[in-house]
């Protein structure tokens, strides 16, 4: 069994990348689809096992995505800026994590609240894939967010708001199709209460709102422009 650790300092050098991009650079880990258009399903492969054999934990809590048919969690949903550490365990880990960890575990630790009453930061990332050279669109990516955290007496808190917009390009053939745009709003909140040195409580919540557009799927079907863009 091999454990590889990605620290906050490592993530600092990878600004502008999503979590799927970061993990795909780990030896022995393949994230199928991490370079595809936003909103596409991802495939996680560790030592030959795929999604259902790879467990994903955030602060020790197993996560799934109820919006998908297979309940698999999309690693692009969590902002990299809010991650303190990632542990990638390569190898069978069912004894510790159950049957969902037959070939590996991705264990994500979020940043903790600072000791002062309030602290915050804001960020914005912009980029392009230079697709304007071959297409009428430049497929710009915009990612921005703000975070507030602190500790007041025995209560700690962290609240982050992140939004992502991608002016994607159409996967359909032809020139009459609009870009397949993608937008996401993410709100992440942690609240902790330290009763004493031996007892503490922590509550974690995550909300995502996603809007994704796609083209008509009929090949060779002639329709009006409104139908083509729905």
Locate predicted features.
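N-terminal periplasmic "start-of-domain" segments of outer-membrane beta-barrel proteins
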Residues: 1-14, 43
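Extracytoplasmic beta-strand/coil segments of soluble accessory domains associated
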Residues: 20-62, 84-85
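Short beta-strands and strand-coil junctions in structured, solvent-facing domains, enriched
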Residues: 31, 53, 63-65, 92-96, ...
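Flexible glycine-/small-residue-rich
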Residues: 46-50, 58-60, 90, 110-112, ...
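Short acidic/polar hinge/loop motifs at secondary-structure boundaries
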Residues: 62-90
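Extracytoplasmic loops and strand-loop junctions of Gram-negative outer membrane beta-barrel proteins
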Residues: 69, 88-89, 123-131, 142, ...
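Outer-membrane beta-barrel translocator/receptor signature
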Residues: 81-84, 95-107, 112-172, 180-187, ...
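Flexible loop and strand-edge segments within Gram-negative outer membrane beta-barrel domains
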Residues: 166-186, 194, 198-230
